[in-house]
């Protein structure tokens, strides 16, 4: 994998998640899909929590935009099991499917990326 996008912060309250998703989708224009991986850990798992209503806090719906990963054929998607447990979430709570990995294994895989962008 050449390019890793790491989502570590909550999707609302700041623009980093939206900016990260924009960068990820833009990267698909110049990288092969198999060269891009997406990682969700810490509060970044909330970026995938289904049934959120950001209109209640006057925010744009960034969460549903993650469904575009399927359209763009981004298949290397990983989520931290420990972060899911801390957030009291399960994989069925997520808006898209991701490979669930222990934190240590996820960080080992992340270490193989040529470039890492964190949001």
From Swiss-Prot:
The keyword Cell wall biogenesis/degradation is annotated on this UniProt entry: no
InterPro entries: DsrEFH-like (IPR027396), Sulphur_relay_DsrE/F-like (IPR003787), Sulphur_relay_TusC/DsrF (IPR017462)
Keywords carried by this UniProt record: Cytoplasm
The UniProt record lists the keyword Acyltransferase: no
Top-rank lineage group of the source organism: Bacteria
Location(s), subcellular: Cytoplasm
SUPFAM superfamilies for the chain: DsrEFH-like (SSF75169)
Cellular component GO terms held in the UniProt record: cytoplasm
Pfam short name (any one): DsrE
PANTHER family associated with the record: PROTEIN TUSC
Function: Could be part of a sulfur-relay system.
Family classification: Belongs to the DsrF/TusC family.
Name of the molecule in the record: Protein TusC homolog
Organism of this sequence: Pasteurella multocida (strain Pm70)
